[in-house]
Amino acid sequence: MYDGKQVLRFVNNYKTKDLYLIGNEMNKRIGTGNYDLKKTKFNVHYKDINNSNLYQEVKSILEDRNIEYSRKTKTNILNGVTFTSGPEFFMTLGLPFKETDRIYQSGDKKGQNILASDIKSKEDIPYDVTNYFNCCMKFLEDIVGKENIVMAQVHYDEDTPHIQAYFLPIVNEVKRKCYK
């Protein structure tokens, strides 16, 4: 469907202590990203939390659905996924990019200027880019279940657009090789 390289990165080790920082990054745009706050208004919120913070949201969902879980601090309580690609892919879909004054320090592009999306209005986001992210979201819903997605957003306010989503690692039965 789409040419070029896409990145699908799953993280399955978020503990309760991580949820506050994740919530701040997603909602207040405080964290490790190169945020351009002028572009934050273009971010797309597929699924937001209803409670005051991400921890309360996860706890509420688990309790409302009568899902048993270990309350130990080492328990993996949330999984995350990021869907993205390089600037070249998004440029083929019509999204404008511009060079920044920052330089790649390693990799294939070492020494080249870092490209960042050049979005000034909603009209700068082509239908094909929106459709790409809609397809990514549909794929995620199909593999983890829409009801297990706690938070999902497209971030246009960083160098390269991406979906960042978090979901509950719910399983109906445990299958282990040692029981076979």
Question: For each of these PLM feature ranges, what is it?
Answer:
Residues 1-180:
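N-terminal nicking endonuclease/strand-transfer module with a His-rich metal-binding environment
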